[in-house]
Amino acid sequence: MRVITAPPYYPQWQVGENYSAWRYKREEGAATVWRCPLYVPKQPSTLKRLLHLGSFAVSSFFPLMAQRRWKPDRIIGVVPTLFCTPGMRLLAKLSGARTVLHIQDYEVDAMLGLGLAGKGKGGKVAQLATAFERSGLHNVDNVSTISRSMMNKAIEKGVAAENVIFFPNWSEIARFQHIADADVDALRNQLGLPDNKKIILYSGNIGEKQGLENVIEAADRLRDEPLIFAIVGQGGGKARLEKMAQQRGLRNMQFFPLQSYDALPALLKMGDCHLVVQKRGAADAVLPSKLTNILAVGGNAVITAEAHTELGQLCETFPGIAVCVEPESVEALVAGIRQALLLPKHNTVAREYAERTLDKENVLRQFINDIRG
């Protein structure tokens, strides 16, 4: 297996230590990995994000074309970013490989839903982006994506149903099964979180599509309750949120950097209530990957999603799996938090769902069978 990717930079929007944003790097191991240079903005705006994605599409094109001699059987491209699909399709044509375009986020739909394309769906930017997306989706052998509603969206965009594959985000279920209380207590002490207060946890990217301003509002309304809002992660919107919390004097809200891979099970078990927040219009274009591990740990999540979306349907189909509330409503978010805090700390519905449907080995085995045809 060969992988062409970028140096690690997300969600901090900063290239990791021992990596470079300006040089190629080849790594040998179970797979041969080429790390391609790219532009990484410190504060990503719409224009800077496009330059960021475009820079990777250009830098990755050359090592991608070098794989022609290797003659791959399958080429799997991951979206974001759509900018790389022309190169993927060209390599497939030259090598005779079959192609799979895997959709983590519908970039264009998310951009339109969050109003980042100027004049909306009728504007020239939106029309150009939609045409580019259509070309990518219609000229690969298979399209895979992470939810049933996103599969339906691919079909609505003109992909033949028989060419759409379900490839959900997985969880390493065993990691979240037996988490020692001592590990949770140690992490809690390390972060300086008091034992006598319940933890409202948000862990993940801090960007535009989450709408975390409402979490600030919720913390303000709950400032007299024995709660701590712990915001863990990085992203372009973090500094602004920290400033908002400081201006309001929110002593019940604390911000922390992204925690290590090894600390994740203890971090998630520590949360009495988990926040899975998105703006209206993003819920079917993107499916939060953080939810899989929250379910695996048996956490009680408050999800902001409309009833007809994938997340809304999940909560309706599996009663008790999470608390689903109206997006962009502070009142609904506060009510959802209060409801979640009344539930038993361990959510058996969530854990059992994760065991049945999200186990990493099962998900990968099925995907391999699907792309083999």
For the regions a language model picked out, list residue spans one by one.
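Conserved donor-binding/catalytic core segment of Leloir-type glycosyltransferases
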Residues: 194-210, 216-219
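Nucleotide-sugar-dependent
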Residues: 210, 257-295, 301-316
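Nucleotide-activated donor-binding/catalytic signature segment of Leloir-type glycosyltransferases, i.e.
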Residues: 226-233, 238-265
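Acidic anion/phosphate-binding donor-loop and adjacent secondary structure
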Residues: 155, 161, 171-189, 211
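Carbohydrate-associated surface elements
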Residues: 7, 149, 170
